[in-house]
Amino acid sequence: MDNQSTINNNGNNKVQQKVRSACDACQSAKVRCGREKPTCRRCQNQGKTCVYSHARPLGRPRKSGSASSTTTMTTTTVNMNDLRDDAMIIAGSVNGDSEYGSPTRFRSISRVNNDHGMNMNMNNDWPGIPPLPSAGPRIPDILLDDSDENYMDMFMSVRLLGSLSGPSTVTDHHPLPPPEEEDGQEGYQNQHQHHNDPHSLIADPSAATEWDLGFPFDQHSSSESLSLEPSSAGAHPGDIPTSSLSKDGMDFTHTRGSQKISPNPHSIDSRTSSRDKSFNHHRSLSTLGSRTPNTTTTSSSASSVGLTGSSTTGFSRRFRGGGGGVLSLSRRRTECTCCDSMLQILAELDRHIADRSAISLDLIIKLEKETRAQTVAILHCDLCSQTFRPRILILSGLVLEAVVELLEEILHQHQLLGYSTATTTSNTTSSSLSSSLSSSSWIPSGPAGMELASPPPSIFDNNNTSTTTTTSSISTANRPGKTVDICSLWLGDYEISGPEKQEFLKHLLTARLRDIAATIHQLHETMNRYRHRPAFKVGTLMLGEIYRHVQAIVKTLDQ
């Protein structure tokens, strides 16, 4: 009876053995196990069969122990799936996105198999693990953010990186060929050493900046004669690239000592799709030829912007020759002259406004047509609209506002804003219409000297109860506006004057103002798509005020 109980007890002892708290997969990977049963979280995510083995005895095996226990302690079976998981953990730790440990912690995991005498170190050249990044200068993370809140931080980071000089080169973000054979391995090593030298990125304290405006403030800084046609391939002075180099998905544009930065989606996609390519991508250099400008420049201006004419030498050779590399826009972003053209229109408007002499009506109409055409071209330009440049869009709105101010001066000088053919039947009707018009949004805006001294008077006369055509007496002598020289109107040998001339001007200017309102509305809709950014939000509010101002004038003329 006692013997049977002993056997039962021995059997119970075999069944009720202790189970380890960590599963076999987590124990072999040396990571913390979630201890969920029957399947832990790690094994469930990786699709493995979770096994919780019995607890092994601690300490050294006894000499008198069985052979099975000795074999268990001295023999370790290498599971290739566990080794692959360990390699993935180390790769994630190197790249900084490991979910099992600290990004900066590098662990050496070894497996010893006494049967085969195999020793594997996971930090060696294990297949599938990308190499460690080089020790060269690292671009700050703030440069990867293109939001308006970080414009100043990005600008300071660019000044810390410094400005480099070099010939003009257009590069692409595809795998690049190796350096030329005639340069030899020595030149490639010199190139590598210069690229990883932090002293080659020292900022130039005398570098001029155009970061705040987004376009060249000084129009006389370059002596090139740029064409304004849309088919022209010449770039405006603010966006002339000098050389190209891609690093970590960023594009740098060199503009007379300053650098502009914008993310390149192609480089970012290539970095996320293939880490091996991204780790070695910044070591590659472009060998594409440089662009030849269409315009003729002097030697001094060409040297100031770094142009080399029709040179087709590889970029790597010029980089090793002593010049630094500067990053430019990719080939798909062709240079445009929208900003330069709009600045020329603004300069011409400013010159006519500052001039004390009278401005002719035909010149105002010409400037109005050029401004609207250039604004439409900017709205369809990929570089101006799709690359999130709010400054050129805000500049277009300001130029349109200046044109509206000149057209408004014509209306005031000929009393067209106070001229009405309204037919009233009672004082009540005219009073209600007058109150509704005065309550409409009238926002005077524009440069100094062109603002309205007071809101425009009502086009309805409260004292008029007859059905006759009346003309309100509006005094323009006290208004500090611009004098407009109206051209004569001739129909053959007959000169159109008097009320007929006023009706013609009213019809002409109303049509022009409606076209301007439609252009401003289209510009407002384009900027309203990116209203979450501060610069676009400010531009949207400004264009809304200009649009309401133009609509109020058109509504007054339609009465």
From Swiss-Prot:
One of its GO terms (cellular component) is nucleus. It comes from the Eukaryota. InterPro entries: OAF3, Zn2-C6_fun-type_DNA-bd_sf, Zn2Cys6_DnaBD. Residues 166-316, 453-477 are annotated as: Disordered. Residues 222-232, 286-316, 462-477 have a biased composition (Low complexity). Residues 255-267 have a biased composition (Polar residues). Its main location: nucleus. Phomoidrides A and B (also known as CP-225,917 and CP-263,114) are potent inhibitors of Ras farnesyltransferase and squalene synthase. CP-225,917 and CP-263,114 inhibit Ras farnesyl transferase from rat brain with IC(50) values of 6 uM and 20 uoM, respectively. CP-225,917 inhibits squalene synthase with an IC(50) value of 43 uM and CP-263,114 with an IC(50) of 160 uM. PROSITE patterns: ZN2_CY6_FUNGAL_2 (PS50048). The keyword Coiled coil does not apply. Transcription factore; part of the gene cluster that mediates the biosynthesis of the antihypercholesterolemic agents phomoidrides which are dimeric anhydrides. Probably regulates the expression of the genes from the cluster. This is Transcription factor tstO. It comes from Talaromyces stipitatus (strain ATCC 10500 / CBS 375.48 / QM 6759 / NRRL 1006). The lineage of its organism: Eukaryota, Fungi, Dikarya, Ascomycota, Pezizomycotina. The gene is tstO.
